[in-house]
Amino acid sequence: MANAMGGTAAMRRHEVFLIIALSLISCPMTEAKTESSDVSADVIVKTVTESGREESSPPADAVKIAPAVAVPTPLTLTTNDAIKSSLYVDVFNILKDENSCSRFFGGAARAVHVLNQLTLQFRKKPLRSDLVGFQMSGHYINVSNLQTGASYRLFDKTIANSRGPIYNRNPQDAEAKRAVGRFQIHTREAKALMLLHELGHLLPGKDGNWLLPNDGGDGFLSMRNSRTVEQHCVDQIRALKN
């Protein structure tokens, strides 16, 4: 995840809005449709900060235990982006059941709800580096869903790098030798781990911090964050081959 950190505390400003929304208004809904009602009860707390600044931790009331509710139905993506669709299906199948991976993200219902919102939001665009899979940047909003119990954040921009490992089918030799966790960078498993990594930046943990700390511009921290997700999700990621 990449996010600018410029600006000073003196310049920082906050504007907080509480909106009971009939639908999640923070991300375009034209690219995908779903029969799920899980986006019908979102409480959106919008925190606007000076450009380049962001809150270091979730809101005080963001960390909640997800209630025992049905897992949201999968999105029916209308995009022609087959890679995005297959990646979404892989990660949905990882998170839809109660297992070590979905529990890390707060339970299947919570994890799938936020995965759906992230998938609706991210767009395919080129970035400078061929090694970056996703980039999240800009201001973000804090959201609480009343049905699933999911509290999470969404950034202004979430980009899937069209020049990066998610989409590049013909990597150069040196690039092909790189890995995400234990998985070679252009494999199905690595792509799933990359999307799960981004999900970890959006959800709070039981300690009151984001599951994964911001790692924009810090390659070592990014690798550590991927290893954290891998520790909880490796069995489910490996099962994608079966």
Question: What name fits each language-model region?
Answer:
Residues G7, C27-A192, L202-N242:
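Predominantly extracellular/secreted Zn2+-dependent metalloproteases
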Residues F17-S26:
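Bacterial N-terminal signal peptides
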Residues T8-F17:
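Bacterial N-terminal signal peptides that target proteins for export
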